[in-house]
Amino acid sequence: MLDFTHFPEVFPTDGPRPYDQHFVRQTETFRKSLDGVLFIDRVLGALGLPDAAKAYPPRGDAGLRALHQQVCSAKVSAHAKLSVLYYLLLDHDEHRGSRSQLADALAEEVGLPANYQILMRGLWHMDRKEFKFALEHLAHPSLPAEFADEIITVLVRDGHTTGDYSLPLAYYHAVRPVLQTSSALENLFAALARTSVTDALAFSRTYPDHGARQLLFERLVASVLEEHGSGQVAGRSASRAKELVSLPLTGVEEKWLNDYLSTGEGRKSRSAKAVVQMRQVVTGRQKELGAVVGVRAGR
């Protein structure tokens, strides 16, 4: 059986090598665009490697040998170590062309379980911002929700740039991860709110905590006001505003809406008054208010 701690048994000693200056510059560009952290950095950090961002990408053959030694010396399972080596061989395969299958050959030789391969290939694509390819692997039913918060955050931020939130929502609906950080939850909810007001409301109702629900509800309203007030894509913003005012709200949610638009942060929006009036029309309250005014005027 292959001894993965022996460098020449893992990495080719001849042929083209990926870790030249161009690769390093390209990787640093990807790292910068991903808020300074690649997914392989997180994996190496989980192995206990100090300053993972300096370990990858390795600089030349000497750097690769040093990284290999660090990985093999880590106090983690063999599968965890092999996962990193698999990732590094994906770099080699990409550099050598489509016929190169060094990563898969290693996995077969050492019996690396398929779910480890799927995860690392998905993270490899994430680090190259090939998000559609990444999700083909990361949404696989055999995988636990590893790095779910970070994956959601990266995909939503990309959605802010493209205006398309289909990828983070596809990942969320496929994996159904329990998000651990408030920032990841906020990013997911932002994607939901910009895609479907109704779905975002339903999501907010899954939270038993009253305060958390109110906060999410107010963020939903804020996202509609922001788009409606900025004049972004008039047809879409009008449709979202109509969807908001037509929601079947509970009594508590109705109060949250009124309070947010009349005395809360929402009152600062140029669209607040219009949304209040639209809601009154939809719920019939405008007629009720008109009748009250008529009675008071003696009509």
UniProtKB/Swiss-Prot annotation:
The keyword NAD does not apply. Pfam families: ELYS. InterPro entries: ELYS_dom (IPR025151). GO terms for cellular component: nuclear pore. GO terms for biological process: mRNA transport; protein transport. The keyword Isomerase does not apply. It is found in: Nucleus, Nuclear pore complex. Its main location: nucleus. Keywords: mRNA transport, Nuclear pore complex, Nucleus, Protein transport, Translocation, Transport. Required for the assembly of a functional nuclear pore complex (NPC). Belongs to the ELYS family. This is Protein ELYS. It comes from Chaetomium thermophilum (strain DSM 1495 / CBS 144.50 / IMI 039719) (Thermochaetoides thermophila).
